[in-house]
């Protein structure tokens, strides 16, 4: 039964809850919740409008279809996959398509019950009850059994809310703790792979310090935002055995295809010389969110044959336009000193403009107020600071 369609499609949650109906109070509550979530479901899961969302699901933490497809393309297949924090089942359903055997494990009974309804609908023809198992239980409690049964890949997405409901981003405070899970698996002599989804707010350096076995950090950008950090552990190791990790920044299309990709390592970053531009080239490069999150700012310059303008600007310049850049590339038209006298008459040349800034004394709202320029798309202006300390406004297109 699709609760968000049919005769209930155009009714408000309040009318469903309090209007006349033959539905039971329990079913009314479930139906009102589905109607409330309907627009969010359509936006985040455009091909999955019939999903049933149980009350209490951490909707904002659930993966979208694009990032779920990326995980499946990058880390599948597996002979025996376990999703230890099943949740809504989006990631599980995509990863399980390439698995010979797959277990969805969820500690919350309502979520596990909803998964019985959702997963066959998400997986479609690739769903097979002979190889797909939906179980209720705690990952930490079940680890020993799963390892003994031959688990080859473990995926989990720790809850980022403390018991009181407040958000938490520290690895040790998420549930289950990736640190505790990895320690337990080491004790059990687990030889398989691990994939952990953590908050985009995590400090990558701190994560690598706490989890030395991480071989790859995937920084996944979709719709100009970093949506996920994925920690890939090909095999558990000690601090002394660990190999230098790779940081992989990717930009996804709405369909989950990789549009742009960048790869570097903290070890390489420390070896690159620190050069800064003395003058602007023909093009201006503004790294996207995933590139910025990597923190590999000198490696970015080497990869794209570009030079940063300033240590704190994270804007690059080059005379050669890169064929594939994970960010925005503009042609430099004009450079204007950000002096008070110039700002006062700027609206005579640019009555309307789209203004953005990095390492610039004026925020956009203050810039528009001071210059009396109207926000719009007629011109593109970028405020920044050069290595000399001079603040400038760059017209670009």
Question: In which residue ranges do the predicted regions lie?
Answer:
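SAM-dependent transferase fold signal centered on methyltransferase-like domains
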Residues: 1-397
């Amino acid at each position: 039964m699709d609760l968000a369609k049919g005769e209930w499609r155009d009714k408000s949650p309040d009318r469903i809850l309090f209007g006349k109906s033959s539905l039971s109070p329990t079913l009314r509550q479930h139906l009102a919740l589905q109607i409330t979530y309907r627009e969010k479901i359509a936006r985040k899961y455009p091909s999955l409008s019939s999903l049933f969302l149980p009350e209490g699901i951490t909707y904002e933490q659930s993966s979208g279809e694009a990032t779920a497809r990326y995980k499946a393309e990058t880390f599948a297949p597996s002979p025996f996959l376990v999703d230890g924090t099943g949740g809504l089942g989006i990631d599980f359903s995509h990863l399980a398509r390439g698995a010979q055997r797959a277990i969805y494990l969820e500690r919350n009974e309502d979520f596990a019950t909803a998964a019985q309804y959702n997963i066959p609908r998400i997986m479609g023809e690739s769903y097979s009850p002979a190889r797909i198992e939906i179980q209720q239980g705690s990952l930490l409690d079940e680890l020993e059994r799963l390892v003994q049964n031959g688990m080859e890949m473990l995926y989990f997405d720790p809850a980022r809310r403390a018991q009181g409901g407040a958000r938490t981003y520290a690895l040790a405070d998420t549930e289950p703790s990736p640190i505790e899970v990895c320690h337990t698996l080491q004790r059990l002599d687990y030889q398989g792979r691990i994939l952990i989804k953590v908050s985009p707010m995590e400090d990558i350096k701190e994560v690598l310090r706490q989890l030395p076995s991480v071989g790859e950090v995937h920084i996944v950008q979709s719709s100009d935002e970093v949506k996920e950090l994925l920690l890939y552990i090909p095999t558990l190791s000690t601090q002394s055995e660990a190999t230098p990790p790779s940081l992989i920044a990717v930009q996804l299309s709405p369909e989950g295809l990789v549009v742009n990709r960048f790869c570097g390592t903290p070890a390489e970053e420390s070896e690159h010389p620190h050069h800064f531009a003395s003058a602007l080239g023909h093009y201006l490069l503004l790294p996207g969110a995933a590139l910025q999150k990597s923190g590999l700012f000198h490696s970015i310059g080497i990869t794209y044959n570009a030079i940063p303008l300033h240590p704190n600007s994270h804007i690059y310049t080059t005379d050669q336009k890169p064929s594939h850049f994970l960010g925005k590339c503009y042609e430099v038209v004009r450079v204007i000193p950000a002096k008070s006298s110039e700002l006062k008459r700027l609206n005579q040349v640019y009555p309307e403009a789209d203004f953005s800034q990095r390492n610039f004394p004026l925020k956009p709202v203050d810039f528009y107020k001071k210059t009396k320029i109207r926000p719009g798309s007629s011109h593109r202006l970028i405020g920044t600071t050069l290595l000399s300390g001079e603040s400038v406004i760059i017209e670009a297109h």
